[in-house]
């Protein structure tokens, strides 16, 4: 058994009026997975702390109208990922905000925002090179990609190969 918190449910699964779901999805901030030290939002993407707080407030206000029982229904099928293992009597912590970790990249298939380069990569030339490599990959809309610390000294071809592997893995999971 596991525990799925309300804020860990992706809006695609919401069984609510379409207009409300679209409003929530339009304002949903990126889901950052704090369990991975390697992937974080790139600091130069132009979004301020205040902007994130406003988005979070709007999302909370829209979601406050609903109880979790209204949003997902009994026996509804959800694709979840374990983010924290079961411990004692507590069940595992689950999320529908998925992340697939490869050798050099982390693919977040249902996170439209987010992505970039690991914060642990501090060398400016490496960051610039990796940012160019990431933008050349043409990540589909609705997905996020983070280049991990292990990818810092890797070539564009190695990063692309890892990214393509993660995309194939995601397609296999979806089938």
Predicted regions and their residues:
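Single-stranded RNA-binding surfaces
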Residues: 1-175
